[in-house]
Structures are given as structure tokens and as C-alpha cells.
């Protein structure tokens, strides 16, 4: 009898087809519906990219206006959801709050069990609109601050920052945040997206699939890496009065020592990209803009030193989480909120995959090879 080939972690397995995004490891490129992600980040708003992922094409002016009006009118946090968040301890991880909030949003949605294309699109749009209120309120309550209501006169990114910090962000900060949302929006069959598709394949509802995806994203091998990057910076020590070169020298020495001790350093390497994450140059430009805006050269020094030491020792390049972590830190987000920010962006990709799965569904049920004891009698 021929032994089956086992693909641990489903490595190298093509599970299905998708028209949503294409990750090309050979050319280190990422396309959303055929468009290079770096071009979308340079020319589009996050709202336009969300529309693209869900509807296959970029919106025209009237389509964008209708979409923006819907998003802005569905931002407010329902009292039931706020109440559920308030029941959770501020000692729990924000990912637990995010998972719970999405579950409550699903339970309260009038079309919760309706998986028609129209209902799923409406639920996806509503979730995109409301989730920033969850993240912003959770950060504020952990600081002992009150909820800030959304503003319909601000776009998605500007409003997100307003609800979190209580002041209008500078245009360059809004743009950097917008870029990060676009870059995190979608990335093919990653662990959380595949989780969402598996759940959807059982004919479970959209919010159940997103809740499961959040559970997958909580793991440090998937979504927690941007938090881990900041923990590395904090372990090295962030000294605001330090020069770029001084910070680089310290961080490079830290990395050399960490690699000698065979420590796992997050923010480097990627399961798909072997020659560098295609999203990094665009996100690094956003980080550079934030370093200039806030006059924080020591952050660039820490970044450069770690990157150089890893390249020299292992020839491993950064992934998206590496520049994203310090970017969010400079904006003022608490480190533990970084992965919920990932959710805010990836809701678009997850729900696009959920709708694609529903449209051509087959229950995802792989086989396993048993390696336990042979059949035996109970004594």
C-alpha cells in the first residue's frame, strides 16, 4: 500500500482558486483583483480598496459616494456591543475583546443567518464601518478615557484616529494609516483567511467565520508579529534623545546576540516571499514619513540596526509587520492594539473570501493519516 504524502501545515498545497488576490513569490508581487498593491496604496483610499475587494472593480464616483455614505452612517458603537466590551476586564488581550465584539455584532444583526450575496455584502460593509469604534473604544477604556463618538465629516482613516486620540490627525499621519490599512487588507490563503473559508464552507454565517478568523489571527505566528516587533524595540530600549547612529549600533549588537542565542526574532521572513515582502517598501516609506513628522530618528536607527544585522547573519528580509509596528507606535497606538488594527484592515479580505466561498461552495474536509495503535480490545 502506497504511503500518503503528508503536507504539514498544508505547505505547497493548492486548496482552491481565488480571483481576489495573487501573491507571486517569484516576483515578490501582490495583486488585489489584478492591481499592484503598491499602486493602490499610492493612488487610492482604503474605502476604494475595500470596494474593489468586494466588487471586483474600483468604484466610479457615484458608487464611491454611496459606499462612503453607508460606511459613515454605520460607524456608531451599539450600546449592546459597548456593554459587552465593558464586561471584559482591561487585563484581557484586546484580541479577546475584538473576537467578542464581532460575535455580539453578529448575534444582534437583523440578517445574521442570511447568507445571500446582498446580505453578506451589507454585513461586511457594516462590520468594516463599526469595527474601528471597537478598537478605538477599547484602547481608550484601558487608559481610563471615555468613548469618543465618530464623525461623519471625516474619512475612514481620519475618523479612526479621531475616535482613538480625540484630535484631528495631521494629513501625513492619516495618509500613513490609510497606507497601512490597504497593505494589510488582503493576502490570499493565509491562516486566518483559510480559517474563515473553512467555517464558511460549513454554511455558517459571516460573523461566525470572521470570529474564527480573529482566533487564528491572535496567534503570534500569524497576526501578533507587529506587536512582537515593538516588544523587541522596547527590550533594546527606545531613547528619544539618542541619535540615529547610536540607536543603530545598539540594536545591531542586540540582534547579533539574539541570533547567537538562537532567539526567534519576529518581523523577519515570510512563508511565501523568499526574496522580500513586496509590501515592505511602501510601508517603510510610511514609517519614514512618521519618523520625520514626529522627529524620532532613534526609531529609524533601531530599525536599520536590526535589519542590517539580520541581513548580514541570515540573509532574511523584513516582512510587513516590521515597519508597521513602529509606525503604529509613533501614531500613539498601544502595542497590544496593533493586531486589532490588522483586523480592521483584514475584515475586507476575509469577507471577500467568505463571499467567494459561498458563491462556489464545497465543504472543506481534508483527510488525515492515522498513526496510533492498531485496533485492540478494551480489557
From Swiss-Prot:
GO terms for molecular function: 2-methylcitrate synthase activity; citrate (Si)-synthase activity; citrate synthase activity. Its EC number is 2.3.3.5, 2.3.3.16. Disulfide bonds: none annotated. SUPFAM superfamilies: Citrate synthase. The active site is at 222, 270, 321. Optimum temperature is 31 degrees Celsius. Cold-active. Is rapidly inactivated at 45 degrees Celsius, and shows significant activity at 10 degrees Celsius and below. Belongs to the citrate synthase family. PANTHER family: CITRATE SYNTHASE, CITRATE SYNTHASE, PEROXISOMAL. This is 2-methylcitrate synthase.
